[in-house]
Design a protein with these regions (language model features):
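Hydrophobic alpha-helical
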Residues: 81, 89-110, 177, 189, ...
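Hinge/cleft segment of the Venus flytrap/periplasmic-binding protein
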Residues: 29-31, 161, 165, 169, ...
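Bacterial N-terminal signal peptides that target proteins for export
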Residues: 1-12
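Short beta-strand elements in bilobed, periplasmic/extracellular small-molecule ligand-binding domains
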Residues: 58-69, 157-160, 178-198
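Extracytoplasmic "Venus flytrap"
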Residues: 32-52, 56-60, 64-80, 94-98, ...
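Flexible loop/hinge segments that line or gate small-molecule binding clefts
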Residues: 99-137, 148-151, 249-258, 262, ...
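Short, solvent-exposed amphipathic alpha-helices that sit
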Residues: 44-59, 138-145, 168-186, 226, ...
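Hydrophobic alpha-helical segments within soluble ligand-binding/sensing domains
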Residues: 76, 131-157, 200-201, 248-252, ...
Length: 314
């Protein structure tokens, strides 16, 4: 339900208000932040994230250099090192692979550059703060939803489609799922659906037709947004196969409303864009930022209304 995100957003609101009370500097002393995403600029989640980040940059009077690597880790690594060379006032980045930023974070800290992670985390790097969901807990919440609602049983094999197998989000979410399913003897199958929209639908449809999975956990937003088209193509009626997973798109929100998806997770994408900038602004002003802001809540047909209203305003 939407209420599960209240605590994290309360902390986030406090950060935002504190940051907004700081008056922007002149053009000559404007702070410069780099924001680096592993996502693609045309992805629905990242469009909303970018809107939030851009709003924060404007409201806080800072210069933000935003880049998207489209899943190319080498390109993101190059962008991070270019940011380090520019000696900015702060860097915010995703961490799509464990250990990807160990050296870079150490170099940034040595240079006195604040580092905030968002969307995907790697606390072992020593980053100063994180904005986003606890992905391992997200996986556990999805699995517990099925168990609590008696939608899976021992011996079932749950379909886990994902865009990028091996990425940190897949690994962490699957760890959370395993913590619930393994003791109960519920099996699961992580399947590479790819990132191409047409390919996702084709691969998922083929799997559903061939395997008749008893339940589905969509580990990413693109696979979650494809559920209706996959089920329609495979001849699966809405509600006959339980589905949970991510819900950061209008498509998935509509799937929840129409019964194709039982419950979906919302990461408050615009807030996830705004808050890293606010945290970097605080750090650049000398304020300590050693805390995380969790942006996550589960919604279903009874609570999807506000999310659909938000999308319909755009």
């Amino acid at each position: 339900m939407l209420g599960t995100g209240k605590r994290g957003l309360t902390a986030a609101a406090a950060v935002m208000m504190s940051a907004l009370l700081s008056s922007p500097g002149s053009a000559a002393d404007k702070k410069v932040f780099y924001l680096l995403s592993h996502g693609g600029p045309s992805d629905a989640f990242w469009i909303d994230w970018n809107a939030g980040a851009t709003k924060a940059c404007d409201q806080l009077g800072v210069t933000c250099k935003i880049s998207f690597s489209g899943g190319d880790m080498a390109a993101q690594k190059e962008a991070f090192n270019s940011a380090l060379a520019a000696k900015p006032d702060g860097i915010a980045t995703t961490s799509a692979q464990p250990g990807l930023w160990t050296k870079e974070v150490a170099a940034a800290k040595s240079a006195g550059i604040p580092i905030v992670f968002f969307n995907t985390d790697d606390p072992a790097t020593g980053r100063q703060a994180y904005v986003g969901a606890d992905l391992k807990e997200a996986g556990a919440i999805w699995a517990r939803y099925f168990v609590d609602h008696k939608m899976v049983k021992k011996g079932d094999k749950v379909f886990l489609p994902v865009e990028v197998p091996g990425a940190s989000y897949q690994q962490l979410e699957t760890e959370g799922i395993a913590s619930v399913f393994d003791p109960l003897g519920v099996k699961y199958d992580v399947v590479d659906a790819g990132t191409d929209p047409a390919g996702i639908i084709s691969k998922m449809t083929d799997y559903v037709v061939a395997n008749h999975p008893p339940a589905v956990i969509a580990l990413g937003d693109s696979v979650a947004a494809s559920i209706k088209r996959v089920f329609d193509g495979a001849g699966v009626k809405a509600g006959s196969v339980p589905v949970v997973g991510w819900g950061n798109s209008k498509d998935t929100a509509e799937e929840v409303k129409s019964g194709y998806v039982n419950a979906a997770a919302w990461q408050f994408p615009s807030a996830q864009g705004f808050m890293p900038v606010a945290l970097l602004s605080l750090a650049a002003s000398g304020e300590p930022i050693g805390y995380d802001i969790h942006t996550f809540s589960l919604y279903d047909a009874s609570s999807v209304g506000p999310i659909l209203n938000l999308y319909n305003k755009k």
